[in-house]
């Protein structure tokens, strides 16, 4: 039989998959180290086709069963390639190597699934330069026996206490194997071990002297005897190990200058923590039930790497715009690969949404210090895990969290823990379907405990293992008010689509791209009541009044008051209309637009009065602003933060040069509410725009609109070492006011090309002598812009 085409080429690393999901964890680890790995199932080709393979290295993966009955071609491949290329066996792969060379595989004496053991090793071969006592994650019930091991094989590693074989090596050939899983997130120095294997060359240790396998100066590796059961040390559970490490982390943070407990108290007293919202109220306010708590989660002890390229801020914004009520951020660094920075950036990313989700610090909270950290970095709530705390300590941390205005999420896993949470008076209780001591998942846990909170004023949350709408619907029927979803969301190829499917949300309407919209129009440089009223009757949505003294269209405060009085009087004669549209969670600039382009802009309040200023003292802005103007336009080089000091919305002008400069920070949220693009006159010393009739490059403006206000992640998986822009999409076009060049003759084309939110005109509708507005041109401009 000939090989399939994809196996007929030279192969860097061939991995034989023994039908085990861990194969792909191992595959990912190797790929992240730069390896080119080809994976085939152990029944993909017949034994007779093995000699046709052209490979540089062979790996035999983990797998269930016994090597003699369940390993397919693995043993034959080891026999053929031993002495020709480097070979690595993992878990069942080790058992296959031992079996091939004449050893016996038998019951290990204990089933080790997800258990962690420290190991000693011989510091040679793939263990070269690795520290002693490294932690190893074990998933096996079989192992090699020392007494039956053939002379060709040497023991290279054993567990520290039980002396179970964790590594073997052929004495002549470059054949290494480990019983544990180096690719596991809990296994220490796993990448280094795999990296060493990738550096091996040829089929013998003589060809690899740098690995010191044949070095006579090194001492022999002493296996030792298995100690009596009574002296065997207890192996800590994963939960115990995590909590012990978190205590070390907290102690280190407390001792670091700038982050001492006193420092955090001072910062909190200075009100430097972001404003908070009520966690329970946010869950209750969810429009779609159950409320979704969407989690940012890069890795876990049970699953290893999940989405190592995930960007916490972008993921949080994607969740929020898709309908999440809570953003849960893992901040544990060692096993979950999270950080406080992740949480702070996630909070910043959603800070300017009109209905921002609550931020949950998901961590192993064991100290009040961590609660201070959480509040300072923007959390609205923290997780308290009953399984990690004594009842007294739980009460203390719960009360302390409440003292900072944060109602905690209290996590339970069984009836006893639920009783403790209810006694505590917790308002939000989460049931973790995953037992944190062994990380096994039982989806029935929430269902069994739901009855205990029925008829109580408690929001019950399901916290783990949720993968589809069926799981969600089952919990809703049992009274669950919120679901936390992490891994499934992080692995989803389309995050927003998965959330819609999970919560049975219909597809929302387009946010702007490809959607027909009519732009607003503004007539700038109004100088008289007559011009203002004529522009208003023509359908202008905004009128610009120039307060820049050097402008030829400058109006005094007295004249501005007269114009404002005329417009305000006109407004009062119009009926008050409401839009009736439910406000959605939308990005900052999109949310500033009138709902359905109606209400204020199209009806009773139209047109709005805009005061235009340029590099003038704040006192000048504020004098006319409060009683007269609806908006302020900053047309100079004013600091962006100045927008926070005005009592009315602010339009910030971006001065665009012919080469595209001037667009930096166009989409920065939270300061000005609207952005206007105007063209800089070529050769201008001030680099400021306005009043010259210079046309903005419409292609540049179009690209700015299409680039979008925000980019939401399609998937947390990304496509490289970081989540690239190609892995995200702009669902919300950037709303801009297009100035600089539009006039009655070209505004329709400008609208078609750029798709602006509004168009602005000044000199393009003036009389020939520039003394005022040509009212016919004003009417023609509005008509052409709105395609009336």
UniProtKB/Swiss-Prot annotation:
Known catalysed reaction(s)? Answer: N-(5-phospho-beta-D-ribosyl)anthranilate = 1-(2-carboxyphenylamino)-1-deoxy-D-ribulose 5-phosphate; 1-(2-carboxyphenylamino)-1-deoxy-D-ribulose 5-phosphate + H(+) = (1S,2R)-1-C-(indol-3-yl)glycerol 3-phosphate + CO2 + H2O; chorismate + L-glutamine = anthranilate + pyruvate + L-glutamate + H(+)
Q: Which pathway does this polypeptide act in?
A: Amino-acid biosynthesis; L-tryptophan biosynthesis; L-tryptophan from chorismate: step 1/5; Amino-acid biosynthesis; L-tryptophan biosynthesis; L-tryptophan from chorismate: step 3/5; Amino-acid biosynthesis; L-tryptophan biosynthesis; L-tryptophan from chorismate: step 4/5
In Gene Ontology terms, what is a biological process of this protein?
L-tryptophan biosynthetic process
Spell out the catalytic residues: 91 (nucleophile), 181 (for gatase activity), 183 (for gatase activity)
Top-level taxon of the source organism: Eukaryota
Q: Which residues form the signal peptide?
A: none
What name does UniProt use for this protein?
A: Multifunctional tryptophan biosynthesis protein
Q: Which gene encodes it?
A: TRPC
